Amino acid sequence: MRFEPFLNQEEIRQLQEFEKNGSKAQKRTPEQIEAIYTNGQNILVSASAGSGKTFVMVERIIDKVLRGISIENMFISTFTVKAANELKERLEKKLREGILMTDDPEMKAYLNDQMQAIALADIGTMDAFTQKLLNEHGYLLGIPPKFRIMQDKSEQELLKNEIYKSLFENYMASDHSQVFLRLVKNFSGNRKDSKSFRDQVYKIYQFSQSTENPKQWLENNFLLAANQYQDYDDLPDETIDALLQSMKETAISLRDLTDLEEYGQMTKAGKPTAKYVKHLTMIEALNDWSMHFDSYYGKSQIGKLAQDLSALLPSGTDVTVAGQKYPIFKDIQSKISQFRHLATLLTYQPETLPLLLELQSFVIDFTEAYLEAKKSENAFEFTDITHFAIEILQNEEAIRKVYQSKYHEVMVDEYQDNNHMQECLLELLSNGHNRFMVGDIKQSIYRFRQADPQIFNQKFKDYQENPENGKLILLKENFRSQSEVIDATNAVFSHLMDEAVGDILYDDNHYLKAGSDKQKIRYPENNCQVLIYDTDQKDNGEDEHDKEDERRTEGQETLSPGEVNILVKEIIRLHQEEAVPFSDITLLVSSRTRNDLLFKTFNQYDIPLVSDGGQENYLKSVEVMVMLDTLRSINNPLNDYALVALMRSPMFAFNEDQLARIALQDSQEGKVEHFYEKVLNSLSHQGQHAELITQELHDQLELFDQSLNAWRDYSRTHSLYELIWKIYNDRFYFDFVGLSPKAEQAQANLYALALRANQFEKTTFKGLTRFISMIDNILNTENDLADVDLAKPKEAVNVMTIHKSKGLEFKYVFILNCDKKFSMADIHSPLILSRQKGVGIKFLADVKKELNATQLPSVKLYLETLPYQINKKELKIATLSEQMRLLYVAMTRAEKKLYLIGKGSQEKLSQKFDTKREGQHLPKALRESITNFQDWLLAIHQVFDSKDLSFTIDFVTDNELGPESIGSISHQSNIMIDDLRDNRQSDSIARAIDMLNNVNQLNQKYEAAINLPTVRTPSQLKKFYQPIMDIDGVEILADKSQTPTTFELPQFSKAKQVTSSQVGSALHELMQRIKITSHVTEKDIQQASQLVDAEAEVMAKIDLHKVKSFFEATELGRLIQVHHDKLYREAPFAMLKTDPQSQEKFVIRGIVDGFLLLEDKIILFDYKTDHYKTPLEMKLKYQEQMALYAESLRKAYDISTIESYLILMGKERIEIVECS
């Protein structure tokens, strides 16, 4: 078979011309064609939002396949597993289309082979690849192939804490313990523990792990800044230049201010005013000192310049003219503060070096000890696996050359989110001229994962300036958004983003351009809107915005009712007037927390709202916290916090007044007693203030105490699972949370708590005390458990974080809480790290001598060392740049219309920013000083001509947000004609049938529980195990007498129908009879269907195309075909188990539908034909059964890795659910 060669540049140019003049409705852009067909060199594709980068990657891969490059000879890295699966699906679809289009048998066979190879090709995350590499070559480092990944943060934290504690004790007992103690106190301050120091150690460790060689970075880079910045001459030139530039700009701003007509330069007598003379002196000095800095001061006298400036300028930042404040001195004052105490800093800085050396030593020792502990467990973090892979590729030249010769091309998606560790790995896999990198620096928003956008930026500049090093291709056409969204985005970022703040200059190389004529059609009603809730309130003489500023200062940044009402009003208008489906609307928020008001208000207005779910907030959900405090109280009633929380909860609803009355019931004056003891005193009327306990309160306490004691007694003889459900049922708590705004999620959380308690007791750990201890350990390490996933209604408004929305698109987008301050906590951290400069710390200095405070034993003061200040400046710019990119990602999600919503005082915000600009950008100092999205937008709107901005700003008052203004949702009846079609009986008969059907369904659903024998021998299965074992596909060998629990319903003239169970049984048999080969055909399925023992009416109900799609469209189906020689079906098993309570043995027997026996793992699968609502429901129903199957196979074959899957066949299409 002959393959076509790759296109040269002239052929690519001709193809671009042909495409341009062609008649296709959707044409590829010249840049897309160039990115698809260019070959033989490194390529960086800068793909703006919505520019079709995934399309380009798929087309490029397919083109290479058609030119004879096997898909197994490409390394294709994606950012997420989901992205990898989507890419595989697209490739498979294109290959299938290719098979149908060609008549060449050889080409058909080749493309079919390529389709089969997708499952085995290196298409996935870098983590997946490094695990594969380590499985093959880990022996070179002494790593056994059966290692596991420590994905649970709680497990990581527990092991880290154990290593830290041991190492800490060793250092405290060492001969350098005094230096170490000073180091710990430097970070712990007045705290009586070392938690603050431990946090900094973990922070350094985490940061170092993102480098290609953590130990090397700690040894060579960690102390670079500390060693470098020891004197005035060591100060970075850019720091001095920033001060001098600020002096010049301050002089210009002050001159412009004095030239205002309302300034008043002269008195009535015609003489200059004192203020004018003073300001002229400042202007002259600022210009003179900045111009002659080297001759007047120089670096060695920078501290004196700062003192002179402090004497020259006012201490405040504003100049008031005609009642208007102008922040003329704001920027220069912030710059001066860095140098004012420079001499003092340089005096004390040498004292930090011994502490930093000790810190360096401790972190290196911790890193090594932690790695050794993980090796002993044969369990590693993802970063460990990558470092091992890098070490193997660096040290083993033969292995490195195998990979470099194997891969025709090394492709990576989302390149802007790479860290230096990943970049090193890609370089090792590449031969130096076969890299293909796709990304967009404007969408780099994962700095918290140590992603470094400068990796992308350096490549961008290098290829732009040196084309011989690689080709730069720009994809600027946006195929997602209408012009109104594109224009607003360009307007914002052309004035906001440059290399100084934002990492790149947002110029013609990065402007978004509409990719189709349809997008260029103008819809003025869809212009971008910034809607700000006006917080100006004159009631009580207090400004609501001032109170809001206070709340923000305290970190309580929640959505206000006004903002939510603006949102609701517009959503109702869109839905009612423009018939916009709720599912076309998405709300973007900065974090998952503090959004309860959204759900509450939407619930009030009958607007369906679903969340993206999120992760690791489970233990902090209110309903779970209530239950955990209940369990803590049962375990130990003397736990005051838990007991009061339980009493205050909806289960017992004691109010604050009642709790205060109980708190006064000490048995003796001056005696300290627990709250539960005071409860008992209240019940026995033995308290000091018994008269405060009313009869109503006494009755309420009696009910509480009875319930608590009943639960305590029950907990001693029953499982945790049973105890939790007893609490739910006794106090109707499960039903109560069903009335909350997030009822479905809340009930799922409570249900999951019972399941997790059940799973916990299957381990070697048992009992309430240990369960509570485990939960508290997780919370103490500031970790959590994953949230429970729910099937979400399709027709609902979506709310998700901006990070979660990346890569997605929505018709209408609302960006909420735009006035929320950026998180700057890292900038005020005791320690700041830089990859290039190393560490900078705040130093706890004793300035007693400096202040001549001889009468005091010591005067401790935190000083920001020079390395700290330099790193702080770098970190602040990096944080602001990432916030700009976050706003870019949020704005570019919208297809039709974009809204941004915030709040603030119209009076204060309308004239907050002056009209000063730097070319087409807001002044750098202004951009650095702004701390929220809203102020960036306001500043742009006030500085630049609003006609050219493509977005409007409107303040909305309470008068516009009344109930009548907001409106309401009108609902249509949910009753469909089809529901009434066969209703030919009287209402009474219909009701009777419904009742009998319901009874029968309940009998069938709870058949196992009803049929439990009332009298059992010790050898029979204990009740505790019944919910686990007595499930579909698992038979318990125990004699039991049983009474039938089903009865036949009278037919009431119903026509005979094929039951779903008959269809399910036939479908199940069909799947077992299909002959599995490397390629299951439709003919194979037809032949198998003829062997099924079922009536023709039943077989007519089976969709054979659904069965075929399982083998063609699902990864599991393809895997079964690829490994058909390792497939086992209808495999019986028997397993002996011991009941831990009675020590009696019992046998479990069952039949496994099928499994693949591979060298390193077993892939177990089971067909389920039940009707179901959500895959999660089926997973919860059958996960225990699958766990038993897995345990049996694990013991039989001595293979620890078992992947379990349910093949759900109860709907129109087959779904695969992992149960591992």
Curated annotation (Swiss-Prot):
Catalytic activity, EC: 3.1.-.-, 5.6.2.4
Subunit and interaction comment: Heterodimer of AddA and AddB/RexB.
Keywords per UniProt: ATP-binding, DNA damage, DNA repair, DNA-binding, Exonuclease, Helicase, Hydrolase, Isomerase, Nuclease, Nucleotide-binding
Cross-referenced NCBIfam families: addA_Gpos (TIGR02785)
Family affiliation: Belongs to the helicase family. AddA subfamily.
Its biological purpose: The heterodimer acts as both an ATP-dependent DNA helicase and an ATP-dependent, dual-direction single-stranded exonuclease. Recognizes the chi site generating a DNA molecule suitable for the initiation of homologous recombination. The AddA nuclease domain is required for chi fragment generation; this subunit has the helicase and 3' -> 5' nuclease activities.
Region (Disordered): 533-559
Cofactor: Mg(2+)
InterPro entries per record: AddA, DNA_helicase_UvrD-like_C, DNA_helicase_UvrD/REP, P-loop_NTPase, PDDEXK-like_dom_sf, PDDEXK_AddAB-type, Restrct_endonuc-II-like, UvrD-like_ATP-bd
GO biological process, one term: double-strand break repair via homologous recombination
Binding-site residues for ATP, renumbered to this chain: A47, S48, A49, G50, S51, G52, K53, T54
Stated name of the protein: ATP-dependent helicase/nuclease subunit A
GO terms of molecular function: 3'-5' DNA helicase activity; 3'-5' exonuclease activity; ATP binding; ATP hydrolysis activity; double-stranded DNA binding
Any Pfam family the entry gives: UvrD_C
Species this protein is from: Streptococcus uberis (strain ATCC BAA-854 / 0140J)
Reaction(s) catalysed by this chain's protein: Couples ATP hydrolysis with the unwinding of duplex DNA by translocating in the 3'-5' direction; ATP + H2O = ADP + phosphate + H(+)
Domain UvrD-like helicase C-terminal: 519-807
Domain of life from the UniProt record: Bacteria
GO cellular component: cytosol; DNA helicase complex
Record-annotated UvrD-like helicase ATP-binding domain positions: 26-482
